[in-house]
Structure formats: structure tokens, C-alpha cells
Amino acid sequence: MGDQRVHKPRTAKTRTLRVNRILLPMLLLFSGETTSVVTQLFSVDSSGLGISLMQSVAIALNASSLALANNTAWPLQHEPPEDRLEIESYDYIVVGAGSAGSIVASRLSELCQVKVLLLEEGQLPPLESEIFGLTGALHHDERYMFLEEAVPNPKCCQAMASMHGCVWWHGRMMGGGGAINGNIFIPGSRENFRRWNSTGWDWTQVHKTYSRLQQRLNPSYLQPNKLNLKLANLIYSGSAELGVPRMKQPLIAGATFGYTHHVPVTVNQRRRASSARLYLANDQVNRRGNLKVIRGAQVQRVLLNAAGSRATGVIYTLNGVEHTAKTLGEVILSAGTLNSAKLLLLSGIGPREELQRWNITTHQDLPVGRNLQDHGMMPLFLLFGSNCAVNSTRDPTENPYAPVSITQYLLDNQKGPLASGFYMMGYINSSSPSSSRGEPDLHVVAHTLLPKGSTGSFGYLGFRPELIQAQQDILQKGDLLQIMGSLLRPLSHGKVSLSSKNSADQAKIENHYGEAVEDQQTLLRYVRYIQKLSKTRPFRRCGLRLWKPPLHECDTLAADSDDYWLCYIRYFYVGAWHSVGTCRMAPRKGVDSQENGGVVDERLRVHGVKGLRVVDASIMPELPAGNTNGPAMMIGEKGAQMILDDREANNEVIQEC
């Protein structure tokens, strides 16, 4: 008989195999040479079946990853004429493809007879923007974010790195902030819109717009993992001991009290979905020849006629070359709360004294940039003193970055830890947490478990190096529960003005977080509420106790005194990136001495300028009681409908594509 010795395949070293198991799913995301990748990673002989099976999985992974990263659904990039003297003309020019602007451009281009130009400074959103478990990687990436700072203010944001002011992040890509924020879709409440006090914007009218919007968005709920469900139950049981209930009805910010982890978000096939993804990235829109999209376009200013009474177009730069686009219809600014205000100022629309400072001709004296508002947020930390049901058991398969999670996401229809998420929200009357009367004034949100040994959250927030180190040191001892408190109706407002006449420079931002005495008192009540929560039986079972970061200025004050916590507020009450209000909707001559009237009317038309509207969160007279992304999309939908209605009012025959 011949040699019947068993063939012993070559085996990779254990360490190499472990690394290869980690690298395999990631390499296959970008590799088309599946056979060679598999054989190189697993240096073994095979009769064929093993390699064939691995190759089949690799091909499936590769196909799934390519489909996930597919950008062909987006409208093609339009190239303006090379000859700068050849000026294109459009019926509508929309500036900004964010949460509102994407909807406006899509809705207007439904009319076949109109030409629409959409100008967006950013580019296509990256893969990470559509995966809940990966979006955090983009939050310091200037390719996709405007990382702007306010003027340093000794009365707020003192925890920021030396000589830095509060950070104001906003999106810089198709989808804008909606492509990078929490995708939370909360409408606001009836009372919110009553206080706006604008014709056509009461709850009855706004609710109709939300109903139309929700048919397209189809908001749904994230699936939390087991660990987050345990955390939710800890919050539910602890807050119940204080008389704060678990919400039984759907979440309506500002109208319901209590806690819930059933927070609606905008998703599409288990992927994060901005309004740009839902309204622009589809074949139906791509077939429209009347919609032109230019990415990477930085708008310099709006062109006005000699009298400053009509918008006639915009000037923008693309790849360093200046272009002009004209319109016989309208320019719609949807560039966001900071940039829409900046563009109006650069165009000669704003406070006269501000424009004179920069030698800009004043076409319309309006309070542009005033009334800047943000919910703000302040973190408090509870250190786990012992293992409990919340943090004692962690399933390694629930790590979103584990190879098994990546493989599951790609092969199992975008399921698994990468697709999961967790939002826990509480709406509370800080004066009487157990009361359900009146309106909540405190939003307790983002109950985040910072695991032992992790890098923590201070680096992400841009805090001082010594604070980052202190948090990392305490995380060597145990897990931290981070809780954010946010004011639903802050009285401290800021403003936006120009830092130069160059449109490429960020606006000058002045904020005053927590300076109003009423805001300070609400934040103090928030601290006392969390202290009471930490003393409930469920929290005591986990050994949870308050951890206070070292603050030399504050630590010299009496421990746990109001003075100490007011000092803490000056350091840690920072931006929540919910900016609104700089192009306030109100009559031109308002009686409100602080804001001195409005910038746009109830149909979002800039006072005194025909053919110019602002359609984004900057028009909000005051903050909604919750996240601003949903209301911003509502404004986009309602603003687009107003423009379409105005065409019908002119007896034009509407022809839809």
C-alpha cells in the first residue's frame, strides 16, 4: 500500500490567527480579490471545500459592504459652465442640503417646469454616517463637520481647553447635521408652537405638516442591547421611587412627563437616514433633469438688485473659481442657524451698526444673528461602587466593533450591535419632579455607561487635558454613569455676527449659557434631583455615588453648596448643538425689546426683500421642547409647501413630474 500518512496542513501562529480573525471582515470591506485574501489570511492546504466555503462568505461580505457603501443613488454632481461669463439661471436656488434644505430642493423639483439648483458646501456623507455604532468617529472630522467655537466667555464653558470657547458643531455634508446627529425625531408640543405666535404655525397646522412628513420618514425605534435594557430598568425603578413615572403614551416633548427609552428615530432599512438620504438619494429624484446639485460650493453672498429689495441670485466658489447663479424666482437659505445668518449679513441684511462696522451697504436693517438659542447640556457622573445587574455582565458579542458584530451587520440585513442604539429620556418638572402639571422644564437625557478602562467622554467634548486625565483615572476604578441635563426653555440667549467679510471664515459666536438666574436655578434643581436619584434603593444596590471632577476654583467652596454647583455650572454647562433663532420669524417691528422684531414673516420671506426666504432652524422664535432635527425637517416640508402654494396663488398650472 502507498504512504497513508495523514497530511498535516501548515498552521498559522495563534497570535497571527487572532489578528487575522479581526482583520478579515474589515479587509473584505474593500477587497475584490476574495480568493487570494482568504488563502493569504489562512495559510493552509485545502481539499477545496473549506476555501470554497470561506470564499462564499467572503463574496457575500464583499457584496454586502459594496451595497452599503453605494453612493450611486445620489444626484450627479453638476458642473457649472467653464466660461464664467456664461451664467446659469434657475427658478429656485437652495443654499444648503441639510435637514431642511434637502426637503425643500426635492419638493420643489417635483414640478417639472421649474429648474432648481441645490448648493452644498460639503460632499457626500461617508459610510459611518449611516451606521449608528460608527457615527461618533466623524465628530472631529472637519471634512464632514464645521467645528466652530464661540468667543471665550469666563461665565460659561470654562471646562473647554485653554483659550477656547464653547464648541458649535454642525454638519458639512449632504444631510447636514441630520447626517451626523442622533436622528431623533420628536415633534415638539402644542404649547411650543402656541408660543411661536405666528399665523399658520399653530399646532393644528404644524401637525398636518408632520403627518405628511412622517409618511416619508416612517420613524421607528432603535433596538437596545441587553446591557442598555438593564440600564433603562435601573433608571425606571429609581425614578419611580421619586414619583417620576415611566411614559405610557408616545413621546411628545414638552407635553409628557416621565422617562422612556422608546425614542423615535429616522432610519431606512436599519440604517441611519438623514432627510437628504430620504428625499434626494433615490432613482425617482435622479431621473429629474430639472434638479441640479453642486457639492463643494461655498456661497459667498446673495445678490440683490440696486434697491436691495429683491434677490437676483448668488455668488459661490467651486474649486477656487467664482461662479454666479441667477434666479427670476427665489433664493432659499437653508444653510443652518449660523451660516444662514452669516450669509444675510454678508449680503447687507442685518443690524445697521454691525454692517457699518464692516463697510457693508445696509439694504435691510433687521435683527439678523440676534436671538441665538441652544438647550445646552450639563453632565453629572455616578461611579459604580459594586457590580450589579447593570454593569456586572457584558456579552462580548454585543461589542459593536467586534469582528462578529461587523460580520453580522453585513450578512444579516444590517442587524446586530452596529445597528443598535440607546436613548433614555426624561422630561421633568424640576420644581416638583413627581408632578405632571404644567410643562416640564428639564430634559434628563443621554444616560451613558462609560466602561471601566475606557477613555471617557471629556476628550470627545473638547475639555481641558487635566479634566480628560482625571476622568480616565477614575475610570480605572470602575464604570461611570454619565447623565446629561438640558434646559427646555433657557432664558440665556446669544448672538451671531461677522468675524470678517470673508465668507470662508466662521461667524463670530457669542453665547451666554447659564448666565440667566432662572437658568441657574433650574440647573441647581437638576443637580439635587440626580442626588436624590442616587440615593434610591436601586441605585444604592449598585453602590452609585456622585463623582465630581477636580476643579480648583470650585473645590475651594463649601462642598455641595449652591455656590459650589454654580461654579460647576460655569465649567460644565456647555452646548448641545441645538442652535436656533438667528433669523427669527416675527413681525418686522416687534414689541419684544430683546429681539427687536423678526427677520422673516410667517411665510419665511425676509422682510423687505422679495424672492428671498430662510427655511431652516434659524427661523424658530424659540426652542422646541426637545431635539431640533424633527422640527427642522418640518420647517423644510412646510416651507416648501408654502413656496408651492404661492405658485398656485399666481394661477400657474402645476405640472408634477
From Swiss-Prot:
Reactions the enzyme catalyzes: ecdysone + O2 = 3-dehydroecdysone + H2O2
Documented EC number(s): 1.1.3.16
Names of the cofactor(s): FAD
Name of the encoding gene: Eo
Keywords: FAD, Flavoprotein, Oxidoreductase
GO molecular function, one term: ecdysone oxidase activity
Protein family per UniProt: Belongs to the GMC oxidoreductase family.
Function of the protein: Involved in the inactivation of ecdysteroid molting hormones by converting ecdysteroids into 3-dehydroecdysteroids.
Species: Drosophila melanogaster (Fruit fly)
Induction entry: Induced by RH-0345, which is an ecdysone agonist used as insecticide.
UniProt superkingdom: Eukaryota
Protein name: Ecdysone oxidase
Active site: H578 (proton acceptor)
TM regions (residue ranges): none
GO biological process: ecdysone metabolic process
Pfam family, one: GMC_oxred_N
